[in-house]
């Protein structure tokens, strides 16, 4: 009888572990689905402007105000799901496996790559010669940012997140070849002062993120 009790206890324990494992796998899939849904929403709505005819048809059908409102709403919803899904997938172990092992020195490469990324990001809003030379500095900054973070993060969630942004930026950059740079600044050219403003602003933004912003936004400090 004692043997039966022991056997039954072992069977019950195994069943409990199996149920727990199944629930864990379902939770992992739900978190992954959250991230993928967010990425799909964000990029689908941002693919529409790549086809001017489709964008014009939507604006003509619903009006510019409703179009902008829906665009913003879907974009924000996608970003919220991306942040939630990516955040929940961190530290999941088997649910978010490491696909390779980044070398220790890659962190220094990433920190260097982010310097031009921040300068180009600021240059997108400054009518400088940098903006004119690059053409679409925002997309170029996005490409560098995504590529750099792919180098430093080897988990599945990071591959989905940063890989998706890299592919989107490359495709969008190809799609806008030959078009003037969008936005209120258009293709306006500036001089040395504007270049210096873009560089100084980019370096300032880089320092802010390096010493404070990244740790506050992601919980991961960049410096010891």
Q: Could you say what each language-model-derived stretch is?
A:
Residues 14-31:
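Short, Lys/Arg-enriched N-terminal segments with co-localized hydrophobic residues
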Residues 2-11:
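Extreme N-terminal basic, low-complexity initiation segments
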Residues 27-135, 140-224:
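Membrane-anchoring alpha-helices and their flanking helix-loop junctions
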């Amino acid at each position: 009888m004692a043997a039966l009790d022991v056997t039954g206890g072992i069977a019950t324990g195994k069943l409990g572990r199996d149920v727990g494992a199944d629930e864990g796998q379902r939770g992992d899939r739900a978190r992954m689905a959250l991230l993928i849904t967010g990425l799909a929403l964000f990029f689908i709505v941002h693919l529409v402007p790549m086809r001017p005819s489709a964008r014009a048809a939507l604006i003509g059908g619903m009006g510019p105000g409703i179009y902008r409102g829906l665009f913003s709403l879907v974009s924000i919803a996608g970003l919220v799901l991306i942040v939630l899904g990516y955040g929940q997938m961190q530290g999941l172990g088997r649910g978010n496996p490491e696909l390779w092992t980044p070398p220790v020195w890659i962190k220094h490469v990433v920190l260097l790559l982010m310097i031009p990324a921040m300068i180009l990001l600021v240059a997108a809003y400054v009518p400088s010669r940098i903006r004119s030379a690059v053409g679409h500095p925002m997309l170029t900054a996005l490409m560098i940012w995504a590529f750099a973070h792919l180098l430093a993060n080897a988990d599945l969630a990071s591959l989905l997140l940063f890989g998706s942004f890299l592919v989107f930026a490359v495709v969008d950059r190809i799609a806008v070849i030959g078009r003037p740079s969008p936005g209120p600044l258009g293709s306006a050219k500036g001089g040395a002062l504007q270049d210096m403003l873009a560089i100084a602003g980019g370096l300032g933004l880089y320092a802010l993120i390096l010493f404070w912003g990244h740790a506050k936004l992601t919980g991961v400090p960049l410096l010891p």
